[in-house]
Each structure stands twice: as structure tokens, then as C-alpha cells.
Regions:
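Substrate/ligand-engaging "lid" and interaction regions
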Residues: 1-504
Length: 504
């Protein structure tokens, strides 16, 4: 079977949207599955729906997999994207051939870094996008030189690119770029800007350039939200897809249907970017923080809020939980009655986001294991659920039923018939009889192992008064200790599903 390229695609009779020739308007540091299923998908739609007429040049931020660039280039930038999942309760399996990518360069081989610098000098270039992992936005003094080919770190590479552009256009204020950071760290754009300033100072670059870098360019922090499995794991399913497509695709990509990109930027940026006109789920806002809070407290908080009890009740994957009226009902009550009222965004927007969460959890193509979500649940409950829990008590002057039960379920999960403390976990036994391994910070596992012979009352008191766990003594919250103990005893005696049902 022939490998995908424009000629092969044409011969298959593909009749979807394709853009073969257009100027490169976007430099993208990162060629991985996530950006290609997310950012490049949005640019592809913008080409079709908004007449953007722009290509994206991919730059590999590290040089450990140059073969990926070869594969992308063999396919002339084309690749097949499947967006699969559930939307408004309906199964979705949508295919699109993405044609917004021009090519991919590995700047560590041959003269490819020169190609990157040449693009920096282009009149057509408007935007830089990056996803270089959480470790990518980092500054270490002396790790990168100005004339290195290429500089080591991503921020050093970007500083060099910006300097090249500054020189090419004599510091023209209207030649700055929009820089969209997608790395999963807080304030990603601000952190990137800070790193670039450090490199500029290390390299003794002129003050005029530093001023241009900071004022002519727009460094944006962004929040990304789309689950990207990235590939088809079943060889038979993959073979059937390629047979149906009529070509072999070396860089085929898979993402969930849901996707939202929130960009923090100044007034007017929305009109500079092509996404609003394209009608895609990309928004420009003055502050990304409320949207980050929305994601953490609703999406992540839902996961951490119900999975531990659900696992004790005998469930193994998220989708099966959504098919159970009690567990789904518990999650929805927790979201709509206890979490959403504490968030500082439009209620309709929050309700829609929460409804989409149920669809995402019900994805028929993803077997998301509860045990994988359970990793580090102590810090997760504190970060994702505790703020909603405390805000609800502050506002309503009473305990939130579901979140209190969720806290009891967390304690139950970490103390269910403890068997042993191993080097990398705590072995517990499920009510059904099988053992499971809890993975968390060593101090948290040591704590539960040390309390394995406690009565439930002793254990609840020890957990709630653990300052290392919660940064405060939770027994000072009126009625909480008694409520958590009652919930824990209900889970132990009647099972977690019955305990969840008692909250409905």
C-alpha cells in the first residue's frame, strides 16, 4: 500500500477539504500527536472556514527522533486525524485529512537550523506555537550559546529566532509575533517570556532588542483541553482503517471530540487570530485563570471525586461508571450542586462544560482505568476537590454531601484491608477480594500503613488533623469529623455504591 501524499490522496478520490499551497504563517515548536490533533486541527479548520490560507512549519524542539520529521515530510505534511468519542450522548467517529502542515524540520541535522532562521525573517510569519512538555520552558544559565546550532533549550531557540526577526526588520514594531505556549504549566506564556529575557541578558543582546521582544511581541499563556490518545493500538483496527482509506499513514493521529483552547491575550488579539471567524472552540480572554479553575475543579475534580469509591464498588473503567445510574448521578450532583455554584464564571458556560464532561467520560473509544486516575490521589483531592469543598462550606454554611462522601471514599480506598507496604506502593484489598496497589508520595503511604490497625474513628481523626495532608486541621470544620466517619462506616458496611446512593 502506498504512503499518503497529495498524489496518492487524489488517486483515492478523497473529497474532503485540502489546501496544497499557501505561505507559512505559523512556526510550531513540537511535532507530537497533541499539537497535530489540537492546534493544527484548528488551523486546518481556519483555512477551510475562515480563508486563513496559512501553513504551519513544524520544528522539532529536541533531536532525539529525527525519523518523525522524515515521516511527516514523506507525506508532504499530510496526515489523517480521527476525532472519536461521544457528543450529546451520540457516538462520534470523524475522519479528516489535515493539510495545514507544510513540513517538519529537525534543527539538529544538516543545515536545518538555517531553515528555521530563514522563516524567522519571513514577511508571512505571524505566530509561534509551542508544546515542548512541562520541562521545555526552562532556563539554565550557560546551557545555550547565541551562536549554537541550534541553542539547547526551547526558550533559547525562540530568543534566537526573535533576534533574527528583529535584525531582519530593523526592529519594526509591527513585525512582532504572537507566541502561543501550550505547555502544561501555570502561566506558560509569562514563564516563557521570562526565560527569553534571561537568555537575552546572558548573551548581552542590545537593550533595544529586549525592548522590542517584550513590547512588539505578544507572549500568551494558554489553557489546552483535549485528550489525545495519539494512535490506534489494535493492529487489526489500524489495518482496516488503512484499507478503507486506500493509503498507509505513518503519522496518523487520534484525539477525542471535545477540544477547547483558551488564550490569554489583549483586546484585539481575537481579530488577529483566524479562529473566531472559523467558528472553532478557541477563545481569547483577558485572564485564563477562571478557565483553568473550571477545568481543574469540574473535569479533574469529577474524576478524583468519584473514582476511588467507584473502584471499591467494583468498577474498573470510567465509561462503565457513566452507565451506572448511581455513580453517574453522584458525579452529576457533586458537579451541579456543589462545585459549579462556587466557580466565578457564567453558570450556563459551566453547566455546558459539565455536560461535556459526562460525554467525555462516556467515550466508547477510550478505556480509562480508574486505577490510573487514582495515582497520587492525596495531592489530587487537595488540589482539585478541597477548594470547592471549602468554598461550598463558606457560602452555604453547611457540609456538601457528595464532596464529604468523596473524602470518606478517599480514606476508604487508602485503608481497605491493608496488606503490605512495598517499595513503590501500598497493597490493599478490594471488597471483591482482589488486591490493588496504591501509588502516592511515600509519606502518604507510610501514614496509612502506620494507621492500618486504627479503628475507623481513630483513622478519620488522624487523617483530618494531618497538616501535611491538608495544610490545616479539618476537624475544626463543624460536624465534618462525625459526617466523614458516618460516611466511611456506610462504605465499609453497605458498600460504596450504596453509600453514593445515600447522597442522591
Amino acid at each position: 500500500m502506498e504512503t499518503l501524499n497529495y498524489k496518492v490522496l487524489s488517486e483515492t478520490g478523497y473529497n474532503g477539504y485540502i489546501l496544497k499551497d499557501a505561505p507559512v504563517k505559523v512556526m510550531q515548536f513540537g511535532e507530537g500527536n497533541f499539537l497535530r490533533a489540537f492546534v493544527d486541527y484548528f488551523y486546518d479548520i481556519a483555512n477551510e472556514k475562515a480563508g486563513y490560507n496559512g501553513k504551519v512549519k513544524l520544528v522539532q524542539p529536541i533531536g532525539n527522533f529525527p525519523q518523525m520529521a522524515d515521516w511527516i515530510n514523506e507525506q508532504e505534511g499530510l496526515y489523517t486525524l480521527y476525532l472519536r468519542g461521544s457528543e450529546k450522548g451520540q457516538k462520534v467517529d470523524a475522519k479528516r485529512v489535515i493539510s495545514c502542515v507544510s513540513d517538519c524540520v529537525c534543527p539538529y541535522i544538516d543545515d536545518k537550523w538555517d531553515e528555521v532562521l530563514a522563516l524567522a525573517r519571513s514577511e508571512d510569519l505571524e505566530t509561534v506555537v509551542s508544546n515542548t512538555t512541562e520541562a521545555g520552558i526552562a532556563y539554565t544559565q550557560g546551557d545555550s550559546e547565541f551562536d549554537q546550532v541550534p541553542p539547547n533549550s526551547f526558550p533559547a531557540k525562540l530568543t534566537r529566532v526573535l533576534y533574527e526577526r528583529y535584525k531582519a526588520f530593523n526592529g519594526a514594531a509591527d513585525k512582532g509575533l504572537v507566541i502561543l505556549s501550550c505547555e502544561l504549566i501555570d502561566n506558560n506564556g509569562k514563564e516563557l517570556k521570562k526565560c527569553c529575557n534571561n537568555y537575552a541578558k546572558d548573551w548581552n543582546l542590545e537593550a533595544e532588542f529586549i525592548d522590542w521582544m517584550n513590547n512588539a511581541n505578544t507572549f500568551c499563556s494558554t489553557l489546552v483541553d483535549r485528550i489525545v490518545p495519539g494512535r490506534i493500538r489494535d493492529p487489526k483496527e489500524l489495518a482496516a482503517m488503512e484499507e478503507a482509506n486506500g493509503y498507509h499513514d505513518q503519522v496518523l493521529d487520534v484525539g477525542e471530540v471535545f477540544g477547547v483552547w483558551v488564550i490569554e491575550g489583549p483586546a484585539g488579539l481575537e481579530d488577529k487570530l483566524p479562529f473566531k471567524k472559523a467558528g472553532v472552540n478557541v477563545m481569547v480572554v483577558p485572564d485564563v485563570t477562571p478557565y483553568k479553575k473550571r477545568k481543574v475543579r469540574i473535569l479533574n475534580g469529577a474524576h478524583t471525586g468519584f473514582v476511588l469509591g467507584a473502584y471499591l464498588a467494583g468498577f474498573d473503567i470510567v465509561r462503565d461508571c457513566m452507565h451506572n445510574d448511581t455513580v453517574r448521578g453522584f458525579m452529576n450532583k457533586m458537579l451541579h450542586e456543589e462545585i459549579i455554584p462556587t466557580l466565578p464564571l457564567d453558570k450556563k458556560d459551566l453547566e455546558e462544560f459539565a455536560s461535556a464532561v459526562e460525554d467525555r467520560f462516556n467515550n466508547p473509544f477510550v478505556n480509562h482505568e480508574l486505577m490510573s486516575i487514582s495515582l497520587n490521589s492525596t495531592s489530587k483531592w487537595k488540589a482539585r476537590n478541597m477548594p470547592s469543598f471549602l468554598a461550598y462550606i463558606e457560602e452555604q454554611k453547611q457540609l456538601p454531601k457528595c464532596l464529604t462522601m468523596s473524602l470518606a471514599a478517599y480514606i476508604a480506598f487508602y485503608s481497605s484491608d491493608i496488606q503490605e507496604r512495598t517499595a513503590d506502593g501500598l497493597i490493599c484489598k478490594r471488597p471483591a477480594g482482589n488486591t490493588y496497589k496504591i501509588q502516592d508520595d511515600a509519606w502518604a503511604l507510610d501514614f496509612y500503613y502506620a494507621h492500618k490497625d486504627d479503628t475507623d474513628a481513630q483513622l478519620v481523626h488522624a487523617v483530618l488533623t494531618n497538616i501535611q495532608m491538608w495544610d490545616q486541621d479539618l476537624t475544626k470544620i463543624e460536624g465534618l469529623e462525625a459526617a466523614v466517619l458516618a460516611d466511611l462506616e456506610l462504605i465499609r458496611t453497605q458498600g460504596a455504591e450504596a453509600a453514593y446512593k445515600s447522597c442522591l
